[in-house]
UniProtKB/Swiss-Prot annotation:
Record carries keyword Magnesium: yes
Signal peptide range: none
Function text: Toxic component of a type II toxin-antitoxin (TA) system. An RNase. Its cognate antitoxin is VapB36.
Molecular-function GO terms, alphabetical: magnesium ion binding; RNA nuclease activity
Cofactor(s) needed: Mg(2+)
Keyword list, A-Z: Hydrolase, Magnesium, Metal-binding, Nuclease, Toxin-antitoxin system
Annotated Pfam families: PIN
Keyword Lipoprotein: no
Protein name as catalogued: Ribonuclease VapC36
InterPro entries linked to this entry: PIN-like_dom_sf, PIN_dom, Type_II_TA_system_RNase, VapC_family
PINc domain boundaries: 1-127
The family this protein is said to belong to: Belongs to the PINc/VapC protein family.
Amino acid sequence: MIVDTSAVVALVQGERPHATLVAAALAGAHSPVMSAPTVAECLIVLTARHGPVARTIFERLRSEIGLSVSSFTAEHAAATQRAFLRYGKGRHRAALNFGDCMTYATAQLGHQPLLAVGNDFPQTDHEFRGVVGYWPGVA
């Protein structure tokens, strides 16, 4: 399962009902993954809300949920561009931003479910059940 920044932020902030849904999805997830650039985005968002302690908050959560960090390759960069061309802001109602496009690309290349909060990813080709999006035809 590929984890988006929005899911981590919802969990850390205790956003209801999303935090509960994210926690349940992570509890049932096998090897949740976040790409390295998404980790950077997540740390920036958490730092804006919590200050320098954000890294400690993130690392504790990462340890608790068994979140691994994946590399981001040239293939990921090309898939990110394709995601933007198809679903990017100003191009599609999903209006994916830069970080969203990177998460989408990581999920696409790994053909993994996507854990995210918000109305953007459900506007893509993922079939969402709660906070988890699946590729069409995959449950």
